[in-house]
Amino acid sequence: MVCNNTGVHPKQFKLAQNTRLFLGEKYVLLRPEILAAASQSARTSGRRVVMIVTGGTEQENWVAKMLSHMAHVKPGVLLWVLSGRRLREARVLYRSRQEKAHVRFFSGLNAAEMLRRYSQVRCLIAPASTVMLEAFSIGCPLVTGWIADNQRNSLDYLSRNGLVINSGDLRNVSARK
């Protein structure tokens, strides 16, 4: 059995007899382009751009909530949204009450294009999923949290070790957080 969550201990599993357990981040299946970029020096951008990256989340609702939240936290900052599948931009903007001038949408990027975008932002907001690990592996500053329960263990470990900013439950983001 392979579990690539960071900070997981064998005692947390109930395994059938003769089951082998492979634990830790060395078993993360990152794309070759990501691994190659991770071996290079990290660079961060001074641009006033924050990127919201979706994993396998309920994308439109979550993105609209994050855009609305960011409008209160950082008014006027340029927001980029990166999603695997194309979002209905007009619907997301309407739900978030954001102006098109402050938001730019990207979707369907290959790994090289994603890495280029990551290097152009000041900070990335992502759930504690593979997209977070990809950005983390190339040194992109992160604010993260969990959307699914299986993300909590790794997130807690990375947070305890000062490696990420943990925003907790990203399903219920509000301007008061």
Question: Each predicted region: which residue ranges?
Answer:
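Donor-nucleotide binding loops and adjacent catalytic segments primarily
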Residues: 44-120
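Catalytic binding pocket for nucleotide-activated donors in carbohydrate/polymer assembly enzymes
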Residues: 132-176
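A nucleotide-sugar donor-handling region in carbohydrate enzymes
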Residues: 2-61, 89
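Short, acidic/turn-prone active-site loops that include or flank metal/cofactor-
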Residues: 5-8, 27-28, 109-110, 147-152, ...
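Short, conserved catalytic or adaptor-binding loops enriched in Gly and charged residues
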Residues: 14-16, 94-100, 157-159
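Acidic donor-binding loop of glycosyltransferase active sites
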Residues: 119-130
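A short alpha->beta transition loop at the rim of the catalytic pocket in nucleotide-sugar-dependent
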Residues: 115, 122, 139-141
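Short, well-ordered beta-strand core segments
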Residues: 1-2, 124, 142
